Amino acid sequence: MANSEQAYWLAWSQVKGVGPVLLKRLAQHFELLENAWKARPIALGEVEGFGHKMIEKIIGQRNNLNPFQFLEEHQQKNPQFLTPDDPDYPRLLWEIPSPPPVLYYLGRLDHRESQGQIPGVGIVGTRYPTDHGSRWTRKISQALVKSGFTIVSGLAAGIDADAHSSCLRVNGRTIAVLGTGLDLIYPPQNRQLFEQIAAEGLILSEYPVGSKPERGNFPARNRIIAGLSRAVLVMEAPPKSGALITAKYANEFNRDVFSLPNSPDVQEAHGCLNLIHNGAEVILSENQLLASLGAIPLLDQGQEQKILPGDRQIGYLDQTNVPTLTTGARGKQPLTEPPEDLEPTLKKILAAVQEEPTALDQIVAVTALAIGDVSAGLLQLEILGLVSQEPGMRYQRR
């Protein structure tokens, strides 16, 4: 049965311009989103990232939406979902800078898993793996579940499907994170695997029923895979693989990143080899991996924790104690000129990034693009050397 705070989380998730980053700030500032919903404009203005124009838009949308009526209507098609006030909302996921405000699910929730007491490991990779990549994915997945880990992946073809199916084959626990609504199986050939995970594991999505596989959904989905995981394994990935986005998020969220090596002659190995070159741990064997994962500190199991938005979480990912790389003072250095043939969408995103750190949600609001499209675009702009990422999911021009 839904509580009143759940109604306000759901309502705020419908307000355009207020994405996951700003919504978390609201929750931390007001403690209850009911308080934020009823707050006067001057009080909203006290929250970082809420300017005069945005507040005007928020007030207009707020006046046209009844949270409890919307909740009742929404539950007719989406009966099972979590919001961060729920004790089964994943503890690790709340600690990332952009936790999904609504998490729809099929299958069986595990409270100890939600509290981080049963560790999850993300396994990702290309949709077109070699025999080497598939074979090692199956070996590693089964070794992990036999040691008590939960496997987290994205239900895509290739490495994802290998990870899920091999886990289930030995009666292991697996979580699939979708880039669509729970009513749409993508890719269609994974229907049987989808049904098996729904029966024996857990399927999650931040998208409501009816959401199609839009291009921008999948980079956003990847942050959830990284957020749920204590470590992320990239088993095989060519240079532009989406699995590398998951690895990037994992690094930002202070998760360990592991990568499976292969010959430089194999195109599918180039992304993995680049990760290793940049500091990812090498997967050499099942035992070596298990030993490395065993060195990751456990979450405090002595205190069961319901997520309270106003509290600073003390757990595996305490961002206040994580050393971060920051850029030095820019001075009068000229900005990098973008290439003349830069894609229109990337130009639009770049124009929304300021010389001072700009919040992700602000970029989303200015561009009016989906958060997944913006995240993917910012990653490309980083690779081109046009923007840099700062702590707190902020970006600035370079």
From Swiss-Prot:
Domain of life where this protein originates: Bacteria
GO aspect biological process, one term: DNA-mediated transformation
InterPro entries listed in its UniProt record: DprA, DprA_WH, RuvA_2-like, WH-like_DNA-bd_sf
Coiled-coil intervals, chain numbering: none
Assigned protein family: Belongs to the DprA/Smf family.
Chain's role: May help load RecA onto ssDNA.
Designated name of the protein: Protein Smf
